[in-house]
Curated annotation (Swiss-Prot):
Protein name in the entry: Ribosomal RNA small subunit methyltransferase J
Enzyme type, top EC level: transferase
EC number: 2.1.1.242
Organism field: Shewanella piezotolerans (strain WP3 / JCM 13877)
A single GO molecular function term of this UniProt record: rRNA (guanine-N2-)-methyltransferase activity
C-alpha cells in the first residue's frame, strides 16, 4: 500500500490537491458522503451542483440548466454501443496501445476524464488503471464504476480490469502502478486541450466538463514521468491541430478524422 493512499475495493484515493466548492442537497446523506469522501466543500454560490437521482451521480452547471448533466455510464448508452459495435481491436486506440494477437497490455490512463477511452481498452481485454486528479470527476468515475461492477453483463470483467486512482498524474503515476502491484506496459495520456476559437459546436457535455476542469496547462510535464513508468510505450491522444506534447516528436503517429495518437515506443510488444 502506498503511503497516503486509501484503497477501497478498486478505488485508490490520495488527499486531493484541488480545493473544490460544490452545491448539493445537504439533506441527502448520499451526497454528504460523496462530498466528505472526495474533500468537496459545500457552497450555496458554487457554479456546479452534484445530484443523485435514479442511482446515478450527475454534475450540473447551475447557470445553464438546459444543459444535460454529466455522469459516467459504462453500462448503457454510447459506450455500450461502442463496446458492441465499435470495431474491436481494429480501432485506432487499440492499435496505438499495441493490442494484437497474444498481446494485451496493462495500461495506466494518466488523464482519465470520464473514462471512455479507458473503458474501450478494458472491454478489449486490457487491465486499465485510471488516474484522475479532479475530485469531482473522480467522484463521477467512482459512481460509474460502482454501477458497472454491479452489472450482471460486464461486472465480472470490470472488477478485474478497471480501477481508479485519484491524484495528480505528474506526481502519482508511479504511485498508481505501485498500488496496483503490476508492471505497466503502456501509459495513455489525453490532456485537455483548448478548442479553437471557431469551434463553437463543441458538444454541450464537453463544454460543461471543460468549464469544470479547464485546460491541462501542465500537460507537457506528463511526458517525462510517463516515459519513465511505461515499459513498452507512451500513447498521447491529441487534436489534429495540436503540437507534439512537450515538443517531443513521437516514434509514429496514428491519425483519425479529428485526432491523432502520438506513439512513443520504448520496447517492442512481445506476445
Amino acid at each position: 500500500m502506498v503511503m497516503g493512499v486509501i484503497i477501497i475495493g478498486s478505488i485508490f484515493i490520495k488527499q486531493s490537491l484541488i480545493v473544490t466548492s460544490i452545491f448539493f442537497n445537504q439533506q441527502y446523506p448520499t451526497l454528504e458522503s460523496v462530498a466528505e469522501r472526495w474533500g468537496l466543500t459545500y457552497s450555496k454560490d458554487a457554479e456546479f451542483e452534484l445530484v443523485f437521482e435514479n442511482n446515478i451521480l450527475s454534475l450540473i452547471k447551475r447557470d445553464e440548466p438546459k444543459l444535460k448533466g454529466i455522469s459516467v455510464d459504462f453500462v448503457s448508452g454510447a459506450v455500450a454501443h461502442r463496446r458492441k459495435f465499435g470495431g474491436g481491436r481494429g480501432q485506432s486506440i487499440a492499435k496505438a496501445v499495441g493490442l494484437k494477437q497474444g498481446v494485451t497490455p496493462t495500461v495506466v490512463d494518466g488523464t482519465a476524464g470520464l473514462g471512455r477511452d479507458a473503458f474501450v481498452l478494458a472491454s478489449l481485454g486490457c487491465k486499465v488503471i485510471m488516474v484522475e486528479r479532479h475530485p469531482v470527476v473522480a467522484a463521477l468515475l467512482e459512481d460509474g464504476l460502482r454501477r458497472a461492477y454491479e452489472d450482471s453483463e460486464i461486472g465480472e470483467w470490470m472488477n478485474a480490469r478497471m480501477s481508479l486512482f485519484h491524484g495528480s498524474s505528474i506526481d502519482t503515476l508511479a504511485d498508481a502502478a505501485n498500488a496496483a502491484g503490476t508492471e505497466i506496459d503502456v501509459v495513455y495520456l489525453d490532456p485537455m486541450y483548448p478548442h479553437r476559437e471557431k469551434s463553437a459546436l463543441v458538444k454541450k457535455e464537453m463544454r460543461v466538463f471543460q468549464s469544470l476542469v479547464g485546460a491541462d496547462l501542465d500537460a507537457d510535464g506528463l511526458l517525462k514521468p510517463a516515459m519513465e513508468l511505461a515499459s513498452k510505450r507512451v500513447v498521447v491522444k491529441r487534436p489534429d491541430y495540436a503540437e507534439d506534447l512537450d515538443g517531443v516528436k513521437p516514434s509514429t503517429v496514428i491519425a483519425t478524422k479529428k485526432n491523432r495518437f502520438d506513439v512513443y515506443v520504448k520496447a517492442a510488444m512481445i506476445s
